[in-house]
Amino acid sequence: MAKKKSKDKAGSNTIAMNKQARHEYFIDDEIEAGIELQGWEVKSLRSGKVNIAESYVYVRDGEIFISGMTITPLQAASTHVIANPTRIRKLLMSRKEIDNLIGRVNREGMTLVATTMYWVRSWAKIKVGVAKGKKLHDKRTDSKEKDWNRDKARIMKSSLR
């Protein structure tokens, strides 16, 4: 009998994470989207040269775009391609998903935030979070709760000894 191929691969499929988004926003829902990339950008993503922390997602003319995402070109990139690391990139979603996002942004006053970028087979995907901004007191209560959970875990660990 033939061996079955293992689907587990060494390493992670995650390319980049926006940890700041969880601190700045209440993320209500996350939707997966494809990204329209050029060849040199895919090569840079494979080497992990991307930053989505300062990026933002917006709607224009019924389409979804991401701006502020920096993909640093490789040193060995070809000379005839002019690389723009911060160009505006189109996100690829179904019309139903786009209409849903447009409705939530316009009616409910929600914001679109890029949370995670990862590989699905050979395709680069990005998770777009539908979020609402946190106030300063919300951030304070979150940090207090996080500290308390850390202290609680420390106390439980020491009491088991």
Curated annotation (Swiss-Prot):
CDD domains: SmpB
Region (Disordered): 138-161
Keywords: Cytoplasm, RNA-binding
Name of a matching Pfam family: SmpB
GO annotation (BP), single: trans-translation
GO MF entry, a single one: RNA binding
HAMAP family: SmpB
NCBIfam families: PRK05422.1 (NF003843), smpB (TIGR00086)
Identification of the protein by name: SsrA-binding protein
UniProt gene name: smpB
